Amino acid sequence: MVDFQLPLPGLARDFNELTKQEKDFIAYFSAIDMDSISPVVDCYAGIGPKGYNVFLILARIIKIKERILSDRQLAEVLRKNDLYRFVTKDIQPAHNTFNTLRKRLGPDGFVEIHKRFVLKAHSLGLLEPEIPDLPKHRKKGIILVADSTFLITCGSTKGEKDNQGRWRFKDESVAFTGKGHHAHKYPVGHKAHSLKTVNGVPMATIITAASVYDQKAILPLLDELTGRYPDLPFAYIILDRGYDAEEIHQDIYEHFGIIPIIIRKKMVYPKGFTKDGFPFCPWGTPMKPKGIEYDRKRTKYACFKTCQESEQMLPICDYLKEQYRFGYICHTYFTNGYRKFGPALPHNAIYQKLKPLRTGIERTFGLVKENRYRMEETNFYKGIDNVTIHTVEHDIVLTQDIIFDYLTTGKKSPVLKLNY
């Protein structure tokens, strides 16, 4: 907790008169690293009256945390609430100042601010927490989770059909879905596609029309991720069965060097394999995995001489001899099919450990759906750029939430139970 002198300059009340919630609010904003903001806003002239600079960004953070719906409402509460005035150094911008801020910074400016918050989290060890249950001999790096959510826009329910029966909206970047998502039985505008670390830190978000399928967005999303953080190591990405297509398995691994943990649909293996994908030895005994050779893009299997334990031994098998330590050995190659023979198969230990984490994260954290200050319900902006900024602001706040929790409690994740 941050120590303050009493009374606090600019605060209408004595610090001791504040509630615990109000003290925590001040501590939260005092913990924000201004070096994550000031280098960005200093590059843009005219984002507001002289002296506003970083404090306009703090005001945007207040908007997200307090679930303030519009710029006009934000400008009004900044004038009336002494806590808000204190943490923003008593700035009192007009509502159109925030519109100027968005135009001058643009999506790229807000993305750069978020990037600096993420790198701050990385310096604290929050992107790669040690997860004790994972295999020790795994690829080292950041574990990612991807998901998407619909965003209702202020123009999405005011569409009109043209002569060809197509929907037209005042905001041309939105789309209309006649059937709707299983959780959204109403017209929607945009879709936010997000990548998070397995412990909940948002890494990147892109916005598309709601009609764009998740499969079409995952590669551009990974392009955005690796472009933002070229020096960070990414090891695995956990995806649901909606992404289970051969080209996605292959492209993620080949283009980005990330191992996809994709929940599989039903698979049928060719002759010579068990129904679970284990190859048979020449004498019909199921083999066991011995390791994955990523550099050679293959998985090694061995029989481990299990037939010796069988009542019907095979005396003709030369691989029972002493010089064959693990018995008969064979390989499957990624290039023969990444879904069936790729770098992370359903029977691999890392797959079995990471797969349940996705379900747990969705339930506990809701990814972009529930615990992001109702991002999908609080968007009142038109245009792809403004909607993108809206989502990036939520990413900034959520990243700072995790940083603040770590600084005050030592907790590295709001979604994983890490016993250390």
Over which residues does each language-model region extend?
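Major-groove recognition helix of helix-turn-helix-like DNA-binding domains
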Residues: 87-105
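An anionic, glycine-rich sequence signature occurring as long contiguous blocks
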Residues: 254-255, 259-361, 366-380
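Charged, often Cys/His-bearing segments associated with DNA-binding zinc-finger transcription factors
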Residues: 1-38, 406-409, 413-416
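Basic, short loop/linker segments at the boundary and entry of helix-turn-helix/winged-helix-like folds
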Residues: 16-67
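Basic, amphipathic alpha-helical segments enriched in Lys/Arg and hydrophobic/aromatic residues
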Residues: 351-420
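Residues within the helices of the helix-turn-helix
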Residues: 72, 76, 96, 235
